[in-house]
Amino acid sequence: EIASCLVGSEMCIRDRDCVVIGFDGEQLKVLLINRIGEENGKVYRDMKLPGSLIYMDEDLDEAAQRVLFELTGIRNVNLMQFKAFGSKNRTSNPKDVHWLERAMQSKVERIVTIAYLSMVKIDRALDKNLDEFQACWVALKDIKTLAFDHNLIIKEALTYIRQFVEFNPSMLFDLLPRKFTASQLRILFELVYDKAVDVRNFHKKIALMDYVVPLEEKQTGVAHRAARYYKFDRKIYNKTRR
């Protein structure tokens, strides 16, 4: 049974959408899935955030984990609620309404979604057997118009990240590999804050981060000067936050 409610004669659907962000060393990427629909007798394909409806017998967090696994194959990730989206204009696009009503087999006037955010290492395996959804990573700069208000949800997720890392920067290290270079970390900061970072000043900033630990290991097989690797030490980080 799907969670829904009647407001007057209108049906309101409760939904979960997940913004999953990864970093490939050069670009921020968002996990999207395929949407197949029919409009004016023609089949179309576009993209949307992984999301679906909540069942009556599950709580919000359970629904988010289930939805993400069923649509992408990713499980056991840290998902956090960051905002609810319930504008009446969410169902202003006839294409979206028609797709939703076919899926629900019922007339829908309103849809409210609780958005979840997760930042993961981009090498997480996606389930390629889920042919219908074809989950894939798309560079943030390459994302086109998505279903419903999903472009807005992604924009709000980035705003939330910028605010959150001001007092909890450990969130960013969830995107990095176990060992990373100062350049990778700097590029990540630039992408998150959408502004250039001075290289020299950034190295000074790293030196002040006790939890960013330099390793003896350096890059190999590179044409340029080999860069030193660093690692994020969560134990040291937790001590500095007390």
Residue ranges and their predicted role:
Residues 197-200, 207-223, 227:
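Phosphate-/nucleic-acid-contacting segments
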Residues 16-20, 116:
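Short beta-strand scaffold segments in enzyme catalytic cores
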Residues 1-13:
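Single conserved hydrophobic/aromatic residue that forms the stacking wall/gate
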Residues 112, 216-242:
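Long, intrinsically disordered, low-complexity Ser/Thr/Pro-rich regulatory/activation regions
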Residues 62-65, 69-124, 164-170, 210-213:
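Active-site segment of metal-dependent pyrophosphate-handling enzymes
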Residues 11, 113-122, 126-163, 176-183, ...:
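NUDIX/MutT-family hydrolases
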Residues 27-75, 82-88, 163-187:
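Conserved Nudix-box catalytic region and its N-terminal flanking loop in Nudix hydrolases
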Residues 187-196:
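Short helix-coil junctions and helix-kink-helix linkers
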